[in-house]
Amino acid sequence: MSKFVFNLVYRDKNGEFVDDENVWVRAENKLDALSKVREEYPRASEYILIKSE
C-alpha cells in the first residue's frame, strides 16, 4: 500500500475560500485513495493530490 497526501479545500456557497487542510490515506492506487478521501471528507470542495509515497 502507498501513502497519499491530499490538500482539501473548503469553499462557501459563493465559491469563496473558507479553509483548507492536508490529510493522508493509505491505498493501493490514486483512484482508491481519492475515493477514500471523498468518502471521509464529503464537504470539501476540492481534493488536490500533493504527494504519494
Protein language model features and the residues they cover:
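Short aromatic-glycine-(Arg/Gly/Cys) micro-motifs in beta-strand/loop hairpins
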Residues: M1-V18
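Terminal low-complexity, poorly structured segments
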Residues: F4, N14, A27-K30, S45
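N-terminal processing/targeting junctions
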Residues: D12-N14, V23, I48
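A short, exposed loop/beta-hairpin motif centered on an aromatic-Gly-Thr core
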Residues: V18-E28
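Short, mixed-charge low-complexity intrinsically disordered segments
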Residues: E39-E53
